[in-house]
Curated annotation (Swiss-Prot):
Protein name: Small ribosomal subunit protein bS6
Record organism: Prochlorococcus marinus (strain SARG / CCMP1375 / SS120)
UniProt-listed NCBIfam families: S6
Keywords of this entry: Ribonucleoprotein, Ribosomal protein, RNA-binding, rRNA-binding
GO annotation, cellular component aspect: cytoplasm; ribonucleoprotein complex; ribosome
Leader sequence segment: none
Biased composition (Basic and acidic residues): 120-210
Stated family: Belongs to the bacterial ribosomal protein bS6 family.
């Protein structure tokens, strides 16, 4: 027994059409297939995605996947209808062999896609937060290093001021000592002069007595 045959049509709608019009296109092409005596296996919107290349100035598009079975002639009818629509910017139908695909729950897929997007957003927010924390930590480190450098400089300046003060005090002490020594020398000299005067006076008195 040969594998069953089915067709898979992927078409892309303009990214700027409202959601209700997207639903209208899904319904429209389902009706086209039904009139052509084809059977619809699955009809689901894949969501807005970035295009591999620009199509008619569009960088994004709304992807819709339509799986169906029939005698093959219905494909021409479907693609003719899509070709006449300004909202369809690209379409492609591929003949598939193998087990028929099961109908998927569009709402469930939308929820899954939403969850994935939320997880990605959360991850991006977390990464941005981590980057900010790393930057803040780096800034804090730089501020601390700058503060430490300032403190080291202030400590050095304080030491230099203290050393300068000590040098000044030593110099003042030295000057005081020199002044004292000069004073002592003067006093010794004055005492010596007084003694010499006294001795001269005594000599004069002795001489006068003789």
């Amino acid at each position: 027994m040969s594998d069953p045959t089915y067709y898979e049509t992927m078409y892309i709608l303009r990214p700027d059409i409202p959601e209700d019009e997207v639903e209208g296109h899904l319904k429209k092409y389902s009706e086209v297939l039904e009139k052509a005596k084809a059977k619809i296996i699955d009809n689901q919107m894949r969501g807005k995605r970035r295009l591999a290349y620009t199509i008619g100035k569009h960088k994004e598009g709304i992807y819709v996947q339509l799986s169906h079975t029939g005698n093959g002639k219905h494909v021409e009818t479907l693609e003719r209808s899509m070709r006449l629509s300004e909202d369809v910017i690209r379409y492609l139908t591929v003949k598939q062999y193998g087990p028929l695909p099961t109908k998927r729950n569009t709402k469930s897929q939308d929820k899954e896609a939403s969850t994935t997007n939320n997880e990605n957003d959360t991850k991006e927010v977390k990464e941005a937060k981590d980057t900010k924390e790393v930057k803040e930590a780096k800034d804090t480190k730089e501020v601390k290093e700058a503060k430490d450098t300032k403190e080291v400089k202030e400590a050095k300046d304080t030491k230099e001021v203290k050393e300068a003060k000590d040098t000044k005090e030593v110099k003042e002490a030295k000057d005081t000592k020199e002044v004292k020594e000069a004073k002592d020398t003067k006093e010794v000299k004055e005492a010596k002069d007084t003694k010499e005067v006294k001795e001269a006076k005594d000599t004069k008195e002795v001489k006068e007595e003789g």
